Amino acid sequence: MSLSRRSLFKAGAIALAAGAVGSQAPAALAVGPALGTIIDFSAGVPSAGAIKAAGHLGAIRYVSQRRPDAQWMKGKPVTLAETKANAAAGLKTASIYQFGRAETADWLNGAAGAGVHAPQAIAIHKAAGGPTGRPIYIAIDDNPTRAQYEKQIRPYLKAFSAALTAAGYQTGVYGNYNVIDWCVADGIGEFFWMHDWGSGGKIHPRTTIHQKAKTQATIDGITCDINT
């Protein structure tokens, strides 16, 4: 049976609310028409009511702490109170892990880095009421070279994914076209959230969620990225 983009989108935005139940989300197969939007943010947390009033299906939230040099990221990490409020409003919440950025990127230490970051992702996801059997996205917020992928990113993702699998979760990857393409070839990940940096205007056919560059909105005073 073929899967529509709508079904894939819903699968990538499974509720984190405590006690959430449902069948295991299907693996993403192909891009189709986008029939909804989901937001991500870090500077603060818009209310569930404001998100719903803006017409979005939910939010992708950080299961990672703020960096010491980024205390402005008041929206990190996601909390149980937030996911409960989202669920009560009929909104979905998905999880993504990203602590470092650029010269402090989580993937720079390869598999050893996953040993540090994967347990944190799992712990914060659980603390926010996140069920097993759901994807946690791993961020590759860069435009890496093939050499960086082979030497650092692939080992990082494989080790992180292994930890997620062992804990009962699925693997999502946040990256550009090339990262997704390389991951698909290597069998890493079931869900793919694509950003446009270095993607050359292309959308990978295995994309589950697409974060289009410079597509933002202010909701409840918080700047949010809009994803389809």
Positions of PLM-derived features:
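N-terminal secretory signal peptides and thylakoid transit peptides that target proteins
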Residues: 1-16
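Anion (oxyanion) recognition and catalysis
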Residues: 52, 87, 165
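Functionally critical loop-and-helix segments that line ligand-binding/catalytic clefts
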Residues: 32-51, 180-228
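Structural recognition of the beta-strand scaffold that forms the well-ordered cores
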Residues: 38-40, 58-62, 93-97, 134-139, ...
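C-terminal region of N-terminal signal peptides and the immediate post-cleavage residues
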Residues: 19-33
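Aromatic-lined carbohydrate-recognition surfaces of secreted/lumenal glycan-active proteins
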Residues: 167-181
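Active-site cleft segment of glycoside hydrolase catalytic domains centered on the general acid/base Glu
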Residues: 143-164
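Substrate-binding cleft of extracellular glycoside hydrolase catalytic domains
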Residues: 43-46, 61-145
